[in-house]
Regions:
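Alpha-helical scaffolding flanking metal-ion-dependent phosphate/phosphodiester catalytic sites
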Residues: 224-228, 263-266, 270
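Short, leucine-enriched amphipathic alpha-helices that occur as contiguous helical runs
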Residues: 10-14
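Amphipathic alpha-helical transducer elements in NTP-driven molecular machines
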Residues: 188, 192-195, 260-267
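Short gly/ser/thr-rich secondary-structure transition/capping motifs
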Residues: 102-107, 204-206
Length: 325
């Protein structure tokens, strides 16, 4: 019984420390208020950070091409992802944000398709009204917020089997591989569920923290399309300078890959048709979904002066659909 009381007290103390820390209370003040050492406070905070990293998206965040063979919404814990985003934004606003997203997996995947055409689902995430943020926030604050935002978006995209192609200012361009020819359902539904989770994380994870700290809230528009007219090209080399164990300089050359194609152009263009915190999909993505998933979309009636893309298979204006909620 005494042991249970002790564990309960320690658990309560731990949660109190984390609550105070997440409320931007310095560790030395927490130590003083709770009458424990600052080192113990910092150890508890660090242990929680490591635990969150393990429990968050890491278990499902390797963008291995084979992940496109699975329905990943069932294994992504959106509640943990939201909590992770809250903690990350808190930490970013208090100190230098971390950005540890590796591009090695992207290069490995693209190397397989170099100098060839490949079927891909393209997902484009664009931050709404970033010009207003630039005009209202100091550059260093805006940079910190965008960096934390981008990291969380990258993690959730990877959790759904996507791979970051590149960052374009305030936008993210990602792709999902189609592992079985003409089997579009899984990569398309993973991209759609990813888009829905991105919006949830922004609304329920990032924005509450920004609001509590007096910063403007964020919103995004997302476009998703799929197609087989995507060429993987190599544009030169990235030169990497490193030191070996003996402090001798080593120079490594890593090929720089990019994707060019109609699908990328359509996905980026259709993003502008979405309302804030909504996403749009092309006809081919919509057709790949089941009836229940289709019911969450409505067709967008867009004038030819705004939208004039022609479907490669139909020869008529390519239809786009918007998420309802």
């Amino acid at each position: 019984m005494a042991n249970e009381d002790f564990n309960s007290t320690k658990s309560f103390q731990r949660q109190t420390i984390l609550n105070l820390y997440n409320s931007a209370i310095p560790t030395e003040i927490i130590s003083f208020q709770l009458d424990i050492s600052q080192e113990e406070v910092e150890n508890i905070i660090e242990d929680d950070r490591k635990e969150q990293e393990k429990l968050s998206l890491k278990g499902a965040s390797s963008p291995d091409a084979s992940m496109g063979l699975f329905y990943l919404d069932a294994v992504v814990n959106i509640d943990l992802a939201i909590k992770h985003a809250q903690n990350s934004m808190w930490e970013a606003l208090k100190s230098e944000p971390k950005f540890d997203i590796s591009m090695e997996e992207r290069d490995t995947i693209l190397e397989k398709f170099a100098k060839s055409k490949v079927t891909l689902v393209i997902l484009h995430v664009d931050l709404v009204d970033s010009t207003r943020l630039l005009m209202t926030l100091p550059v260093d604050r805006l940079s910190t917020i965008i960096q934390a935002f981008t990291r969380e978006m990258s993690l959730i995209i990877e959790a759904y089997g996507g791979c970051i192609l590149k960052y374009i200012g305030d936008a993210i361009l990602a792709f999902f591989t189609v592992n079985i020819k003409d089997e579009l359902y899984l990569p398309c539904v993973n991209a759609v569920n990813c888009a829905r989770s991105v919006i949830k994380i922004i609304q329920n994870g990032i924005n509450p923290i920004l609001d509590q700290n007096g910063y403007p809230e964020m919103s995004v528009r997302i476009g998703i399309d799929v197609g087989d007219q995507n060429a993987v090209l190599q544009y030169g080399w990235d030169i990497i300078h490193t030191l070996d164990n003996n402090k001798h300089e080593q120079i490594m050359k890593r090929p720089h890959y990019d994707i060019m194609g109609y699908t990328v152009s359509v996905a980026v263009k259709m993003t502008g048709l979405a309302k804030p915190n909504r996403f749009v999909v092309g006809q081919l993505v919509y057709d790949a979904l089941d009836e229940k998933q289709k019911s969450a979309f409505k067709v967008l009636n867009v004038g030819s002066d705004i939208w004039s893309y022609v479907g490669s298979r139909t020869g008529v204006t390519y239809s786009v659909y918007s998420s309802i909620a």
